[in-house]
């Protein structure tokens, strides 16, 4: 196997070597209470955004900051009220990380398992909006939301998620050294909030973080004024390279978070994402679009699986699955070899950082301490495996009671496939910070609707979508939180327990808040505030799925097979060719992300890596010392802006200006 890739920036330093609280002390009633309040807030915000614009920003950074302020306010209020004994033990960075983990676990259910996209796709209003005469849209395929079945369904499908690949946390965080940009930024922010800002390198990093966090927040606030109503205005739609390139999503959208991802991720990841943008949006999609009317009807919507959208989703997923499954098999082969040899060996894994500096002894000691703590309070493998099997067995029996259309053997298939899919999604999130759980959910929707057929396939597909989304999303969130915990010296055992507590809270809070929206507002009204834009899309996808793979456009499956094999071959080449060659071979998983998201994501990350490359050429030591702090500041500032942005949206305050562009020849 080839030597590991060189990281683009030095890893952030851990907190100073103070005595660490035991894992039990990192879990507090105060923390659970704060997480419940914060999780409820996240559920409301996510449901609100999902029902209006359908776009959900990353909220882990904002959650870490809010957890700090809420817990600090708790202790301050107790002191003011003379309840000193209620202040409890000191508020540590470990408790802050655990609270953030719990709150995200609760709030993410509003995005995944209890998503309004697939739940409202089952209701009568969406059935009527699609049209009673729409082929395949049957009155029998209606299931209106109610607290009873939603809460029960959440407990059945959500608690199992954290068990799926928790035993691979060492592979993700330590062996692969995946960046998890959002988790790294959150950890650096938490460390800065709890650290001492003495005039040393750590203090200067904190000042750098605060500086760029303020700049990023200010820029996001400034951009908001020009973003108008909808998603077609503002700097996010700036045709940087011209109108024609903009039509193919080639533009720089001035998103500080994406530039931060480029600064914090290895160069090979950023270049792979950009290469994927060029291949897909520069050549592949324009070529397929020219076949409209031949390969597929040319009058389809942008979200119809029977058209160009089908190519985008299935080809992207084929590459992701090819890369993910290759690495999953590779990991298991390495583990099996170690067991057979009865001794531990070092293995070369993708995107692993090398410390080539002669003065890196302190960083080596820091990483050694981080690793020791991360491996100290482990989650037993027998517990993870048995927990997954027991919960899967219970769910396999109980889910068909709620959704008779989804037979027990189909539920079993879901749980058989879920760990492999969860690994692929977590691996991709570690590279690019994008959670593609909704994409995997759409694939599950299509596949299981086709397996069931016209008699109940719509409801079965939508329910299977919820099962897969819940497991895949919670697993990726947990792995990202493990990265934060690794950098804040938090116990993985306390984080796993807090994840389970957060999921349990979310199983009640997410359905309750969604049901409140359902009862208080006219959900799905095309002319109203809460249009639920994805509900109709998901129902139509399920209806199309009933036809099976025959509904896909011409040559779609053949092209998918080619890209799946290409992903396997590229990974194999990286493992067999010499290091001086393999380090230039792109990563298929990273290449696949812009296939579906858009080329602008690759452009933004590539600009980030160009900045870092130039910085390293000018002053390598300064770049290694401050790149992660700058990147984290950019990510944190944009993430924190999501809080006031969501509040303004909830209050119905729209940006005053819509800045848009058109060709000069069209000017009047």
Curated annotation (Swiss-Prot):
<comment type="function">
    <text>May be involved in the transport of nicotianamine-chelated metals.</text>
</comment>
<feature type="transmembrane region" description="Helical">
    <location>
        <begin position="209"/>
        <end position="229"/>
    </location>
</feature>
<keyword id="KW-0813">Transport</keyword>
<feature type="transmembrane region" description="Helical">
    <location>
        <begin position="27"/>
        <end position="47"/>
    </location>
</feature>
<dbReference type="InterPro" id="IPR004813">
    <property type="entry name" value="OPT"/>
</dbReference>
<dbReference type="InterPro" id="IPR045035">
    <property type="entry name" value="YSL-like"/>
</dbReference>
<keyword id="KW-0812">Transmembrane</keyword>
<feature type="compositionally biased region" description="Low complexity">
    <location>
        <begin position="1"/>
        <end position="11"/>
    </location>
</feature>
<feature type="region of interest" description="Disordered">
    <location>
        <begin position="1"/>
        <end position="22"/>
    </location>
</feature>
<feature type="transmembrane region" description="Helical">
    <location>
        <begin position="51"/>
        <end position="71"/>
    </location>
</feature>
<comment type="similarity">
    <text>Belongs to the YSL (TC 2.A.67.2) family.</text>
</comment>
<feature type="compositionally biased region" description="Pro residues">
    <location>
        <begin position="12"/>
        <end position="22"/>
    </location>
</feature>
<keyword id="KW-0472">Membrane</keyword>
<feature type="transmembrane region" description="Helical">
    <location>
        <begin position="595"/>
        <end position="615"/>
    </location>
</feature>
<feature type="transmembrane region" description="Helical">
    <location>
        <begin position="315"/>
        <end position="335"/>
    </location>
</feature>
<feature type="transmembrane region" description="Helical">
    <location>
        <begin position="147"/>
        <end position="167"/>
    </location>
</feature>
<feature type="transmembrane region" description="Helical">
    <location>
        <begin position="268"/>
        <end position="288"/>
    </location>
</feature>
<feature type="transmembrane region" description="Helical">
    <location>
        <begin position="443"/>
        <end position="463"/>
    </location>
</feature>
<dbReference type="GO" id="GO:0035673">
    <property type="term" value="F:oligopeptide transmembrane transporter activity"/>
</dbReference>
<feature type="transmembrane region" description="Helical">
    <location>
        <begin position="557"/>
        <end position="577"/>
    </location>
</feature>
<feature type="transmembrane region" description="Helical">
    <location>
        <begin position="633"/>
        <end position="653"/>
    </location>
</feature>
<feature type="transmembrane region" description="Helical">
    <location>
        <begin position="501"/>
        <end position="521"/>
    </location>
</feature>
<feature type="transmembrane region" description="Helical">
    <location>
        <begin position="410"/>
        <end position="430"/>
    </location>
</feature>
<feature type="transmembrane region" description="Helical">
    <location>
        <begin position="383"/>
        <end position="403"/>
    </location>
</feature>
<dbReference type="Pfam" id="PF03169">
    <property type="entry name" value="OPT"/>
</dbReference>
<dbReference type="GO" id="GO:0005774">
    <property type="term" value="C:vacuolar membrane"/>
</dbReference>
<protein>
    <recommendedName>
        <fullName>Probable metal-nicotianamine transporter YSL5</fullName>
    </recommendedName>
</protein>
<keyword id="KW-1133">Transmembrane helix</keyword>
<feature type="transmembrane region" description="Helical">
    <location>
        <begin position="102"/>
        <end position="122"/>
    </location>
</feature>
């Amino acid at each position: 196997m080839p030597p590991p890739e060189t990281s683009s920036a030095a890893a952030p330093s851990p907190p100073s070597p103070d005595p660490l609280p035991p894992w039990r002390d990192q879990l507090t009633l105060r923390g659970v209470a704060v997480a419940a309040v914060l999780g409820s807030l996240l559920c409301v915000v996510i449901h609100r955004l999902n029902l209006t614009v359908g776009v959900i920003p990353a909220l882990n950074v904002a959650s870490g900051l809010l957890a700090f302020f809420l817990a600090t306010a708790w202790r301050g209020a107790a002191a003011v009220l003379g309840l000193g004994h209620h202040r409890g033990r000191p508020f540590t960075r470990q408790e802050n990380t655990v609270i953030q983990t719990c709150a995200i676990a609760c709030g993410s259910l509003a995005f995944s398992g209890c998503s309004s996209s697939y739940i409202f796709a089952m209701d009568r209003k969406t059935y009527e909006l699609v049209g009673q005469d729409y082929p395949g849209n049957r009155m029998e395929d209606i299931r209106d939301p109610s607290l009873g079945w939603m809460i029960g369904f959440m407990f059945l499908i959500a608690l199992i998620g954290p068990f799926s690949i928790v035993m691979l946390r060492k592979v993700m965080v330590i062996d692969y050294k995946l960046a998890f940009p959002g988790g790294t930024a959150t950890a650096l922010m938490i460390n800065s909030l709890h650290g001492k800002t003495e005039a040393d390198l750590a203090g200067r990093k904190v000042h750098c973080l605060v500086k760029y966090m303020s700049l990023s927040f200010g820029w996001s606030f400034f951009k908001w004024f020009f973003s108008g109503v909808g998603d077609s205005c503002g700097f996010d739609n700036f045709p940087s390279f011209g109108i024609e390139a903009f039509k193919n999503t080639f533009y720089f959208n001035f998103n500080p978070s994406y530039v931060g991802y480029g600064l914090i991720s290895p160069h090979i990841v950023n270049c792979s994402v950009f290469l994927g943008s060029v291949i897909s949006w520069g050549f592949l999609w324009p070529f397929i679009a020219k076949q409209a009317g031949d390969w597929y009807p040319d009058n389809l919507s942008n979200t119809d699986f029977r058209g160009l959208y089908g190519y985008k989703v299935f080809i992207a997923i084929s590459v992701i699955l090819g890369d993910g499954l290759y690495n999953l098999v590779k990991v298991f082969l390495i583990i099996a070899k170690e067991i057979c040899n009865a001794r531990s060996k070092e293995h070369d894994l993708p995107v692993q950082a090398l410390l080539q500096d002669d003065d890196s002894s302190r960083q080596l000691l820091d990483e050694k301490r981080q690793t020791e703590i991360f491996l100290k309070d482990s989650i037993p493998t027998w517990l993870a495996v048995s927990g997954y099997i027991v919960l899967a067995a219970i769910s396999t029996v109980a889910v068909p009671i709620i959704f008779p259309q989804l037979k027990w053997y189909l539920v079993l298939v879901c749980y058989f496939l879920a760990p492999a899919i969860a690994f692929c999604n977590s691996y991709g999130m570690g590279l690019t910070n994008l959670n593609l759980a909704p994409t995997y959910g759409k694939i599950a929707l299509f596949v299981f609707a086709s397996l069931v057929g016209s008699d109940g396939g719509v409801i079965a597909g939508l329910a299977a979508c919820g099962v897969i989304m819940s497991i895949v999303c919670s697993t990726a969130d947990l792995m990202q939180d493990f990265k934060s915990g690794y950098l804040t010296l938090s116990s993985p055992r306390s984080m796993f327990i807090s994840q389970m507590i957060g999921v349990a809270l979310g199983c009640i809070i997410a359905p309750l808040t969604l049901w409140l929206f359902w009862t208080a507002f006219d959900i799905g009204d095309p002319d109203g505030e809460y249009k639920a834009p994805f509900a109709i899309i998901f129902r139509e996808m399920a209806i199309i799925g009933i036809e099976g793979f025959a509904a896909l456009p011409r040559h779609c499956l053949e092209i998918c097979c080619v890209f799946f094999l290409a992903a396997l071959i590229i990974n194999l080449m990286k493992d067999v060719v010499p290091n001086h060659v393999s380090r230039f071979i792109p990563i298929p998983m990273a290449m696949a992300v812009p296939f579906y998201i858009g080329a602008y994501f690759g452009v933004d990350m590539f600009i980030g890596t160009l900045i870092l490359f130039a910085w390293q050429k000018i002053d390598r030591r300064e770049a290694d010392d401050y790149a992660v702090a700058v990147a984290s500041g950019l990510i944190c500032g944009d993430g924190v802006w999501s809080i006031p942005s969501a509040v303004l949206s909830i209050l119905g305050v729209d940006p005053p200006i819509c800045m848009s562009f058109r060709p000069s020849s069209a000017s009047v």
